[in-house]
Amino acid sequence: MPEGWAVCCLENVAEVLDNLRKPINSNERNSRIANKHESELFPYYGATGQVGFIDDYLIDGKFLLLGEDGAPFLDKYAIKSYPIKGKCWVNNHAHILKPLCDFDYLMYYLNHVDYKDYVNGSTRLKLTQSDMRSIKILLPPLTEQKRISVKIKYLFCLLDTIACHL
């Protein structure tokens, strides 16, 4: 391991804010948004992204969401962690994280973790909060985290450009 790098548990590099989640069933959510204009609604997020809208918000800010159940944990190319920003509602199928390290570095890292030792379940995989907290994160110094994040963003932009020209 390079000098200055450390192996940390996720709970030491991100604040876990699962206490801000509030489950709501689809019938109640649908009744709350009935007859409301889209401008009166807020994004409603689940394990893999936005799953709808709701008439209120529980959090406001920039957060990283990581699937709890229903996420494609064993697909190494699939998104398991994604950014959200602004006023929104997160359901109980996603963990809410506030990174204490470089935001993008942690997001990219969590999308490439091998989750097989962290998830449970036979038909629907679940990442419990305690297992999530124990995920090992290889953490370089902050300047290196930022350099890695910038390079990954550049490479994704390059891929997008190439894909547009195919």
Which residues are covered by each model-predicted region?
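Residues that form generic nucleotide/phosphate-binding pockets
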Residues: 13-16, 109, 118
